Regions:
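Acidic/histidine-rich, metal-coordinating catalytic segments
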Residues: 307-314
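Feature for exported/extracytoplasmic and membrane-associated proteins, marking the mature portion
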Residues: 1-300, 319, 333-397
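Conserved H-loop
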Residues: 303
Length: 397
């Protein structure tokens, strides 16, 4: 008997979806899906617009301290890494990574005609589009389309969240979103299928599509759950959300699941009011989670196979506001953490605070050049086909 679309969504039963298991599970017949040295990328999104100037601090810049008389971090408090730059005091693990050659920092990253809306700028970053272009697929999603058309690897991209970000949505392929492998089916399917139902309301093939999608997702859930039990991380992690998410990722990486891209978020960095306390709290969570995660990877000889990237949808304005915070800005910095970096430390110069665009930093590096570098050099795919343009590759990997 054929279910109506509404009945299918309402029941959401494992029994109906199990009809798809035999065909789909052929993807998992071979025990060793991942070759040694499999490269993995972990993206950490700083949601809300992190203040880059109080992240990588221009400790000898008089303009910085003039524009931030209360908010500026003093040279004596910063974790100095070069003559002119220091890290936020809460990022001690990053200072250690820097000293060990496992941290690269790229300043003044952005895009032309920047947008100060959280939602629009995040869409631009996640879709890898120009400011005036509207694209409904993400840069990782298009990687999945290019890399996984007809392939037998349905878990190539995973987001540790209840909702899948635009970044991981392609035209034909999508990543998986979940917070815990044990709860993947119950925690992520409801919102996922609501989205599918909206996209296929008038489609005659809607029910067949839903059957297949649900079967694929539940099969993936079973596979991920079983793989996550093979080599669960035994390391001690802090009791924070980010740390728990990174521990889940560590367990999946060490289980040799075939995932190439992991995606997590931390926030909110929208620090209009009392920025110092809020950013310190978030950076403490970040710092402690990264310390545990990188230590875990090193202990299990996987650190050289993993590249961690951080980004935010925009930076903040150079001047502090009247509420001991900062308002929406433009260009920002990015961190790259890994055991196989080719260009270490500060990749480029600190932002020029004497040459601003109406109080905002001018971008010197297009973020899409960063994506092109990651796609080409780390994920070993055709970046121009995915991004629609040829960007000059950077040298940090």
């Amino acid at each position: 008997m054929l279910f109506k679309r509404r009945e299918f969504i309402q029941t959401g039963s494992l029994a109906t979806a199990s009809l798809m298991f035999p065909k789909f599970l052929k993807a998992f017949e071979h025990k060793n899906l991942v070759p040694p040295g499999n490269k993995v990328m972990v993206v950490i999104q700083f949601s809300g617009g992190n203040d880059g100037l109080n992240t990588v601090i221009p400790i000898n810049n008089d303009i910085y301290y003039k524009e931030r008389p209360r908010l500026g971090i003093q040279k004596a408090d910063a974790l100095q890494i070069t003559t002119d730059a220091g890290l936020n005091p809460a990022l001690s693990a990053f200072r250690e990574l820097y000293d060990n050659g496992n941290l690269s920092i790229l300043n003044s990253v952005g895009y032309p005609n920047p947008d100060r809306s959280h939602f629009r700028s995040m869409d631009i970053w996640q879709s890898a589009s120009n400011a005036n272009d509207y694209i409904n697929t993400g840069w990782v999603g298009r990687y999945l389309d290019a890399q996984c058309s007809g392939c037998d690897k349905p878990t190539q991209a995973v987001e540790i969240d209840d909702m899948l970000s635009l970044a991981l949505k392609g035209n034909k392929q999508k990543g998986l979103a979940f917070t815990d492998p044990r709860r993947l089916y119950s925690s992520s399917n409801e919102s996922f299928y609501k989205e599918i139902s909206k996209e296929h309301v008038n489609s005659e093939a809607a029910v067949d599509y839903l059957y297949k999608t649900m079967g694929d997702t539940i099969s993936s859930a079973n596979y991920i759950f079983e793989q996550s039990k093979l080599r669960p991380s035994s390391a001690s992690y802090p009791s924070t959300k980010l740390a728990a998410n990174l521990k889940t990722i560590a367990s999946l990486i060490m289980s040799d699941i075939n995932t190439k891209v992991y995606y997590v978020s931390l926030g909110s960095f929208d620090t209009h009011i009392n920025q110092a306390a809020q950013q310190t709290r978030l950076f403490t969570e970040l710092n402690d989670a990264i310390k545990a995660f990188t230590g875990d990877l090193k202990k299990n000889n996987r650190f050289e196979d993993v590249l961690i990237m951080t980004f935010s949808e925009f930076g903040r304005r150079v001047s502090q506001n009247a509420s001991n915070g900062t308002d929406h800005g433009t260009a920002n910095n990015m961190f790259f953490i890994g055991g196989d970096l080719k260009q270490k430390g500060l990749i480029n110069t600190m932002p020029n605070l004497a040459d601003l665009n109406s109080g905002d930093l001018k971008h010197q590096v297009d973020f899409k050049a960063v994506y092109a570098t990651l796609l080409n050099k780390w994920l070993q795919t055709d970046d121009e086909a995915i991004l629609g343009k040829n960007y000059q590759h950077l040298d940090f990997i």
